[in-house]
């Protein structure tokens, strides 16, 4: 399936399944597929064009791509990030990453999630409300991280060439802005 053939959220999931693997480009433009070794040291966010040409992305890029594809077919949606909070002084480059990005879309008076980056949950999930969706999705990642509390933050863009630390700071800064409202 090509991007031009996408007409529905199921088409987006099918496109992702056919064309995008879990992986990332590093600061040296080397591909890492299916592993997170040296992620904190070498990761950088990829552009949508890089994701499409290399056929790889972690949750950050995959969610951004699905977000753009949903907008392309005129379906309102939002991107969110759940993570164990790390302040900007966190410098353990060997620590595990505890972040997951997800996209929710809104049709027929319901809220839906397209999950592709988490290979254990690939699919489309339905929820009655945005609050229910965020809570249930976040609960999955709280359990996966051993019960640690995880803030959830809506985000609006994926800047190119951000390191993991840069992206985490971007999300933290969005939290600070929302607290000031």
Where are these regions (language model features)?
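C-terminal helix-cap and adjacent tail motif
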Residues: 124-132, 141-151, 156-163
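Extracytoplasmic/periplasmic, Sec-exported soluble proteins
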Residues: 4, 8, 51-62, 95, ...
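Active-site nucleophilic cysteine motif
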Residues: 12, 16, 55-70
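Non-Sec secretion/translocation targeting segments of pathogen effectors
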Residues: 179-181
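Hydrophobic/aromatic-rich core segments of domains that either
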Residues: 61-141
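Secondary-structure boundary elements
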Residues: 1-54
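Charge-rich, solvent-exposed alpha-helical interaction surfaces
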Residues: 15, 133-136, 140, 166, ...
């Amino acid at each position: 399936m090509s991007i031009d053939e996408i007409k529905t959220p199921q088409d987006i999931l099918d496109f992702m399944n056919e064309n995008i693997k879990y992986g990332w480009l590093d600061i040296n433009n080397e591909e890492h597929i299916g592993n997170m070794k040296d992620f904190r040291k070498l990761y950088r966010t990829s552009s949508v064009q890089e994701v499409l040409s290399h056929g790889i992305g972690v949750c950050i890029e995959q969610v951004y791509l699905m977000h753009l594809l949903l907008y392309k077919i005129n379906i309102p949606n939002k991107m969110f990030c759940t993570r164990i909070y790390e302040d900007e002084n966190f410098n353990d480059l060997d620590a595990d990453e505890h972040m997951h990005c997800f996209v929710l879309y809104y049709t027929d008076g319901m809220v839906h999630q397209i999950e592709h980056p988490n290979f254990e949950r690939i699919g489309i999930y339905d929820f009655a409300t945005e609050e229910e969706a965020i809570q249930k999705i976040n609960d999955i990642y709280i359990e996966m991280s051993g019960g640690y509390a995880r803030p959830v933050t809506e985000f609006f863009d994926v800047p190119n060439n951000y390191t993991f630390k840069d992206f985490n700071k971007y999300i933290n800064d969005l939290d600070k802005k929302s607290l000031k409202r």
